[in-house]
Design a protein with these regions (language model features):
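A conserved catalytic-core segment of Leloir-type glycosyltransferases
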Residues: 1-44, 85
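Membrane-proximal helix-turn-helix segments that form the acceptor-binding/catalytic region
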Residues: 31, 64-65, 77, 92-137, ...
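Carbohydrate-associated surface elements
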Residues: 143, 164
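Short N-terminal targeting/anchoring amphipathic segment
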Residues: 35-54, 67-72, 77
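Conserved donor-binding/catalytic core segment of Leloir-type glycosyltransferases
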Residues: 138, 177-208
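A short, basic/aromatic alpha-helical/loop segment that forms part
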Residues: 53, 167-169, 190-197, 218-220
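Short hydrophobic "strand-cap" motifs at the C-terminus of beta-strands
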Residues: 140, 161, 187-189, 214-215
Length: 224
């Protein structure tokens, strides 16, 4: 049932065309996802990080079959074509209602063509369509829910469910000898601007605890 993999880093013309068609129209996704829905017959489809590889086409296909669509948000892609509401290191909300700003400011990878593609993607999979196809958007924070509402999404479609973890397995696995070691904390994740790792490092210099970091990303060489 899986759609064919697309190499979004391809440097060939044919590869770039395939990537653009997947991003803009979900080319190669429709038949496989329809077969999945037919075979599984779900009551609910829960979406996570579907842009590019799958595209919001899957939300439309599920909605057309009368299936409830729940979409958990992990970034600001529905408000910002470049995902992170940042422009040259500054907070930016210019695309909330005027997506063409992503082209003017070359926000996507600081590249004009990539920014044009991001604009076209946002215009095709627009807010009106996404609200029609999605029953509930799950926001992991009140801040995100407020920004979604500020960007024109109906509050009736937004639910706040914080990211969570069960403490019991952690407590049961704690070794007393380990708990007596030095106080420390860790960051595990992508080393990129939107994650705030530079702010974390600045804060760490003012704390008497050891910070451990694990991950990779565009800021790796700057942080080492």
């Amino acid at each position: 049932f899986f759609a064919k993999e697309i190499n979004f880093s391809s440097t060939s013309l044919s590869g770039k065309i395939k990537a653009a068609k997947r991003i803009l129209w979900g080319t190669g996704v429709k038949e496989s996802f329809k077969e999945l829905l037919k075979d599984f017959q779900p009551d609910i489809v829960h979406l996570n990080n579907i842009h590019s590889y799958l595209s919001p086409l899957v939300a439309r296909l599920a909605h057309e079959q009368g299936i409830k669509v729940i979409w958990t948000l992990h970034d600001y892609k529905l408000l910002c074509p470049a995902y992170n509401c940042l422009c040259k290191g500054e907070v930016c909300e210019a695309c909330f209602f005027h997506k063409e700003n992503v082209i003017r400011r070359k926000c996507m990878k600081d590249n004009l063509l990539a920014s044009i593609l991001a604009w076209a993607e946002a215009k095709n999979w627009n807010k009106k369509k996404l609200m029609e196809w999605t029953d509930t958007f799950i926001c992991p924070s009140r801040f995100m829910a407020e920004k979604m509402q500020q960007g024109g999404y109906s509050s009736e479609k937004l639910q706040i469910i914080h990211n969570f973890i069960s403490e019991e397995p952690i407590k049961s696995d704690v070794n007393p000898s380990i708990s007596e070691r030095e106080n420390s904390y860790a960051y595990i994740g992508r080393l990129s601007e939107e994650k705030g790792v530079e702010s974390l490092l600045k804060a760490a210099t003012q704390l008497p605890y050891t910070l451990y970091m694990a991950g990779t990303g565009p800021l790796k060489n700057d942080l080492v």
